[in-house]
C-alpha cells in the first residue's frame, strides 16, 4: 500500500506549548509506531538516495538515530552517530553552535569518515538549522567526497535552509514540508 505524503503529514502529532509555551512541537514518533507509516517513510527516503553512492549515514542525536540506521541498512552503508559531548568513547572532534537560549556542542569520532565517503546526514526536523549546520561543519572536517542532508520534516516558515546558503556543495532535502 502506498501512503501519500499528505497522509504521513496528517499522522504527525502536534503538541502545543512543548517544550516551552508558544512552541508547536511536531512529534514524529507517530510515524514510527505504525509499520505501514515507517515502511512508507523508509521507502521514500531510500528512493531519494538509492543512486547517490552513499557510504555512510550520519545520524544526529537522538531522533536521527531512529531512521538513520534504517536508511544505512537499506542503502548498504554504515551508520555513524553524532552525539552530545561525553557520549562517544573514542577520540572525538567537536563543533559548537549558538542556539536561541545558549550554546551547544556536537561530537563525532575522529576516525568515523574519510575522503572516500559519500555522506548522508540525517535528522528528524529542520527548524532554524543550527544543529544540522554544526553537524555538517563537523562532517566536512573529515573531508568526505560529498555531503547530502536529509530531514523527515522541514518547517518552512523558520527558513532553516538559510544557514546553508554558503554551502552550495551540500544537497539539502526533506520528505515533508510544513
From Swiss-Prot:
Pfam family, one: Pribosyltran
Enzyme nomenclature, EC number: 2.4.2.7
Biological processes annotated in GO: adenine salvage; AMP salvage; purine ribonucleoside salvage
UniProt entry keywords in alphabetical sequence: Cytoplasm, Glycosyltransferase, Purine salvage, Transferase
Family the entry assigns: Belongs to the purine/pyrimidine phosphoribosyltransferase family.
Record GO cellular component, one term: cytoplasm
Localisation: Cytoplasm
Quaternary context: Homodimer.
Pathway(s) per entry: Purine metabolism; AMP biosynthesis via salvage pathway; AMP from adenine: step 1/1
This protein's name: Adenine phosphoribosyltransferase
Annotated function: Catalyzes a salvage reaction resulting in the formation of AMP, that is energically less costly than de novo synthesis.
GO molecular function, a single term: AMP binding
Chemical reaction(s) catalysed: AMP + diphosphate = 5-phospho-alpha-D-ribose 1-diphosphate + adenine
SUPFAM superfamilies recorded: PRTase-like
InterPro entries hit by this protein: Ade_phspho_trans (IPR005764), PRibTrfase_dom (IPR000836), PRTase-like (IPR029057), UPRTase/APRTase (IPR050054)
Main location: cytoplasm
Gene responsible for this protein: apt
